[in-house]
Amino acid sequence: TILVCEKKREKLYRRFPFIDELILVDSFKEVLDEKCQKTLQENNAVLIPHGTLVAQMSSEEIESIKTPVFGNKWILRWESDRVMKEKLMREATLPMPNPVSSPKEIKKLVIVKRQGAAGGKGYFMASSEEDYNTKREQLILEKVISKDEPLYIQEYAAGVLAYLTFFYSPLREELEFFGVDQRHESDIEGLARIPAQQQLKSQKVPSFNVIGNSPLVLRESLLDEVYTMGENFVKAAKRVVAPGMNGPFCIEGVYDENAKFTSFEFSARIVAGSNIYMDGSPYYSLLFNETMSMGKRIAREIKNATASNELDKITT
């Protein structure tokens, strides 16, 4: 196992003996450097993309990586661009909140998002154009967002957060449902502990910065729809961005009071929520006669593809 690791996190990852080698970088953009690519090539490496890599590198940079990338590196452009993301989700017939074209069109509560994998930092809610402008200006002053940064406005969907993680195997042509998690965001979750009177006096724009994840087990009656959504997404991805949605991905949304799911995001690679199932998820325990984490599942797919000389099916 080779870990491409930011220098600031070296001390942490040196603690784990299963990591055979660390490639230290100041930024994941250095994956493109000849020295890094040479090391990966000499070890016949397959690069596993994650959220920080997507956040730090442009789509063009990711697509120019010469090391084989697990999954579909082309679909990461669709994850990073809000307009393209919405197009793919609609192609997959996922139920979605309506987008709002401009601040002038805000008629109800909306959530305003940044492009790419920002981890929720810089997101904010608004109920009118005036509210939007006030909060945007405040975040610019606080240097959380930049003045020329494009923002995406979407009607706010209320309900129980549920992040649905899947794995699609092109070797077996089969979709697997891995598990569900919830993300805990600061400081929006902490507001519930503050009395309403004090909340009204506060001028601070609440943040949606993701701090951690916790497991969730869905009602069994919801699982059939979960599989259908995952299968529809895989089919849509094959039509829209070849070779499709191979490997891990996540459909993110909420369940309302009628247990109806609304999806507001997707991630086309491994997500942090899979960390809570390092010893296997409840659903994977029904599919595999062994503990199976998402990392182990990816490694198993690479091993099987290598044995059958089909690495081209699982990498780009």
Report each predicted region and the residues it spans.
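Short internal beta-strands
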Residues: T1-K7
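Active-site nucleotide/adenylate-binding loops and adjacent lid/helix of ATP-dependent enzymes
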Residues: L3, W74-V160, F167-Q182, R219-E231
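Conserved N-proximal alpha/beta basic substrate-recognition cap immediately N-terminal to
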Residues: E10-K107, A118
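Cysteine/selenocysteine-centered motifs that mediate thiol-based redox chemistry or coordinate metal-sulfur cofactors
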Residues: G295-T316
